């Protein structure tokens, strides 16, 4: 609740509005540093996961996450949870019944379909009608708790089209609107775009991202591929932002402040916003430094996420990468100038190369510094002088000058 209270008090006015309970909330012995193979899980009589009451005391008495969700909603926030694809192996072992059917868990499970990194579940055999019934039952339970957001894991690597479609049907039948986010997205191909749009609200385009420059730099190519296909209700997701104090009770690594430099953090948030990736945090907000709050509340940057269209990479020349987008509320244009190299870059760029139409004049403001831009001329044409630092960004909003 400390994270939720902090978010409501400091970040909600800037659009940060959802708190998600991450992986293995149903395992009493869950730990940092990995997963327990063959763990005993807290399940109900129909093989559905229940919050471990030693970790979530408000779930006692069969209340599930409803008391916690109610508290989150009272703060003006939305409540989400993580869930693994399929049905618990424990339910299969115990031949638990599937609610509302004559089937049991061992009849609807596909025991050949397993997650490579977690032993909690088997996949479902969707040739058996009880498989859909299991997902329907699970989502009815989540809806009764007041869940608004579901991160469904182990869905995309490989691509489990049948599981994804079944989960979508279960949400639609649940009687509650819930956002469906799919993970983990390893080497996700655009060949799946139509199916993703039909069944999910957002989907990861990479494996887990951590606080290393190599992880951030790799997202440039992925988001250049996916950004032109972003649209409301169908979002390619570049993964959580590893800023502030991270890795508390994480699968990998020890608790620490992010290893990303301030410039790298600004680059990351700028790329995510101009590519219109959903923004999710994976940090402990109350113990994060004040500069993290400043990073996450820059309206000039966040506005690009919510009021832009036609996001695209314009140029990749050595370590210089240019992105552009257009405002949905005015004639303004957004331009991000990234430097992925280890030394500073100074260039003068014609405004025409930034996608700014003529005729007419433009003024520009840099979002991170708040300073006016260094507009100049190059070979008689209007131009922008830029000097982004190593691993850094300069992020501009251009407005037409009225005569």
What is the role of each PLM region?
Residues 138-186:
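Extracytoplasmic, non-cytosolic globular domains
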Residues 266, 272-275, 280-282, 316-356, ...:
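Carbohydrate-binding surface patches
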Residues 352-370:
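Solvent-exposed beta-hairpin/edge-strand motifs
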